[in-house]
Amino acid sequence: MASTKEKLITHVSKEEPAGPTNKVTVVGVGMVGMAAAISILLKDLTDELALVDVMEDKLKGEAMDLQHGSLFLKTHKIVADKDYSVTANSKVVVVTAGARQQEGESRLNLVQRNVNIFKFIIPNIIKYSPNCILLVVSNPVDILTYVAWKLSGLPRNRVIGSGTNLDSARFRHLMGEKLGIHPSNCHGWVIGEHGDSSVPVWSGVNVAGVFLQGLNPDMGTDKDKEDWKSVHKMVVDSAYEVIKLKGYTSWAIGMSAADLCQSILKNLRKCHPVSTLVKGMHGVNEEVFLSVPCILGNSGLTDVVHMTLKSDEEKQLVKSAETLWGVQKDLTL
């Protein structure tokens, strides 16, 4: 007796379709992981999304919840398992797993807790997706990107930290608020550590090619009557503020991760401030990962843009590197 499906459909093709070339895995289905997942889905970036976590019930529930929205998405396959075989042949793997930053806790304080988690995660990712591009989002992101690079054995162009992509977005949002202009037309870069020692490049801040330091030479200094310095302070404080108010950050960092995935998967060659190995640049001598403007495309991080920094900006960047190295050198990998 023929089934309903057999009565409805005549199968024509004998060929098994090839797997997707744009598969994305998100490791960790916490607030950040799910914000990244939904942002990636809503941008139509992937034909297959895989989710992995150690918490099986939470993982199953999140996957079901997304699958129930399949009608509203263009991603035909959403899979989830605690077994990493589900991640096989991913093009991009977004790592958001790790211990969560507590109220008042610095990102650097999180570090050894998350290093131990990475020792399990990274080898499993590489086992099933040896050709993937790793996008590290877990904090402290710069140190954990270094850790992922060391543990994975991947070339540096395929290990990227989300870095100050979000800090720069926050900066441009606040700059836009101050000027009454959309953030996409407010150009400013925050580089260095994703965290307390990040460096705002005031010398490059511009709108429509008009450099604001040309209009206000004191911009970013203590002498500035308009107190633009407070814009960067708000960038640094914003995560702490959001954590204090709602307990965690999720939406903006999720959108930031999807933004980076888009540049990679669509081969856009867009320039982003992301965390990469900066040894030998801007006077940094240690093997640290920090954010500088990088071009992202199909093979990962293809180029680094050499910023023209003022001496005080370069000094701050070196100080940022020293802060990270101080923590990094004592890690047990």
From Swiss-Prot:
Keyword Translocase recorded: no
EC number of this enzyme: 1.1.1.27
Coiled coil: none
SUPFAM superfamilies, alphabetized: LDH C-terminal domain-like, NAD(P)-binding Rossmann-fold domains
Reactions catalysed according to its record: (S)-lactate + NAD(+) = pyruvate + NADH + H(+)
The keyword Cell inner membrane appears for this protein: no
Binding site for substrate: 107, 139, 170, 249
GO cellular component: cytoplasm
Residue numbers annotated as active site: 194
Record-linked PROSITE patterns: L_LDH (PS00064)
Subcellular compartments: Cytoplasm
Keywords (A to Z) from UniProt: Cytoplasm, NAD, Oxidoreductase
Pathway(s) of this molecule: Fermentation; pyruvate fermentation to lactate; (S)-lactate from pyruvate: step 1/1
List of residues binding NAD(+): 30-58, 100, 139
GO MF annotation list: L-lactate dehydrogenase activity
GO BP terms, alphabetized: lactate metabolic process
Subunit annotation: Homotetramer.
PANTHER family for the chain: L-2-HYDROXYCARBOXYLATE DEHYDROGENASE (NAD(P)(+)), L-LACTATE DEHYDROGENASE A CHAIN
Record-stated family: Belongs to the LDH/MDH superfamily. LDH family.
The name this protein goes by in its record: L-lactate dehydrogenase A chain
Species the sequence originates in: Cyprinus carpio
